[in-house]
Amino acid sequence: MSSPRAVVQLGKAQPAGEELATANQTAQQPSSPAMRRLTVDDFEIGRPLGKGKFGNVYLARLKESHFIVALKVLFKSQIEKEGLEHQLRREIEIQAHLQHPNILRLYNYFHDARRVYLILEYAPRGELYKELQKSEKLDEQRTATIIEELADALTYCHDKKVIHRDIKPENLLLGFRGEVKIADFGWSVHTPSLRRKTMCGTLDYLPPEMIEGRTYDEKVDLWCIGVLCYELLVGYPPFESASHSETYRRILKVDVRFPLSMPLGARDLISRLLRYQPLERLPLAQILKHPWVQAHSRRVLPPCAQMAS
């Protein structure tokens, strides 16, 4: 749904935003889609959180329960004009069935004559991309924590036969405690066979098999974790070049240039993920057990997830 480096932002953090997020801990969550049909009149609409090609995202509160959400409002005319009805239905179908502390919840959805409304979890600290822009690069502890959260969330997705295919800083939001929330499932796909052959995703993050049009599976997400880890630590993606053709060439040759400042443990992890052959990439379970991740991650599960486990 989003173009590279231009995505809808679900939360530009404001001081009031954290208070609203805290209030949600005691507020009643939105009822499931089967309970009753919602309309826009059920919400108090607040400030805009972001704008995109197909619509806008607003901070909103359910009048009945006072539960704080991000309300994504999409224009049907724009979606139909781009022929993205199927992609939107797929995004809703997939995200509505995913419940994990590091995946942005889609609580409910409804539509009227002109718009489609997605009721999403509010991520008060906004995009990881914005944090990276502000800091230029992240330290080992922050990066390792994000990688552990991401690997755990993707393990959950892959167990449900869901491939995300577009992991990148713009599609990772930050919760109240700074925990990662995978968002934007517009490119993701649910496939029982876990094997696809369509081109999608962001150029800097595309794995070799997708560039070459080969059949691929869930291991495309492993490649993306490697690219993300590099970008978080260095400040730019490993294959970033002056032209698309040069980026493609470097990806296909797996031409990774590690700066001298790259920690050896992180370099080892990235090297095990950025492999031309998908079967050679480090599995998610091994990412979670990797010595560098184990040594530096400070992942803290939210209370609800701790109780569930």
From Swiss-Prot:
Residues 43-293 form the Protein kinase domain. Residues 292-309 are annotated as: Interaction with BIRC5. Isoform 1 and isoform 2 are expressed in testis. Elevated expression levels were seen only in a subset of cancer cell lines such as Hep-G2, Huh-7 and HeLa. Expression is maximum at M phase. GO terms for cellular component: centrosome; chromosome passenger complex; condensed chromosome; cytoplasm; kinetochore; midbody; nucleus; spindle. Keywords: ATP-binding, Cell cycle, Cell division, Centromere, Chromosome, Cytoplasm, Cytoskeleton, Kinase, Meiosis, Mitosis, Nucleotide-binding, Nucleus, Phosphoprotein, Serine/threonine-protein kinase, Transferase. It catalyses: L-seryl-[protein] + ATP = O-phospho-L-seryl-[protein] + ADP + H(+); L-threonyl-[protein] + ATP = O-phospho-L-threonyl-[protein] + ADP + H(+). ATP binds at residues 49-57, 72. GO terms for molecular function: ATP binding; protein kinase activity; protein serine kinase activity; protein serine/threonine kinase activity; protein serine/threonine/tyrosine kinase activity. Residues 22-32 have a biased composition (Polar residues). Changing residue 244 to Q: In a lung adenocarcinoma sample; somatic mutation. Okadaic acid, an inhibitor of protein phosphatase 1 (PP1), protein phosphatase 2A (PP2A) and protein phosphatase 5 (PP5), increases AURKC activity. AURKC is also stabilized through its interaction with INCENP, which also acts as an activator. It is found in: Nucleus; Chromosome; Chromosome, Centromere; Cytoplasm, Cytoskeleton, Spindle. Changing residue 72 to R: Impairs kinase activity. Residues 1-33 are annotated as: Disordered. The modification Phosphothreonine is found at residue 198. Its EC number is 2.7.11.1. Its main location: nucleus. It holds the Pfam family Pkinase. PROSITE patterns: PROTEIN_KINASE_ATP, PROTEIN_KINASE_DOM, PROTEIN_KINASE_ST. One of its GO terms (biological process) is mitotic spindle midzone assembly. The keyword Cell division applies. PANTHER family: SERINE/THREONINE-PROTEIN KINASE IAL-RELATED. Component of the chromosomal passenger complex (CPC) composed of at least BIRC5/survivin, CDCA8/borealin, INCENP, AURKB or AURKC; predominantly independent AURKB- and AURKC-containing complexes exist; in the complex interacts directly with BIRC5/survivin and INCENP. Interacts with TACC1. It is linked to Spermatogenic failure 5: An infertility disorder caused by spermatogenesis defects. Semen from affected men show close to 100% morphologically abnormal multiflagellar spermatozoa with low motility, oversized irregular heads, and abnormal midpiece and acrosome. Belongs to the protein kinase superfamily. Ser/Thr protein kinase family. Aurora subfamily. This is Aurora kinase C. It comes from Homo sapiens (Human).
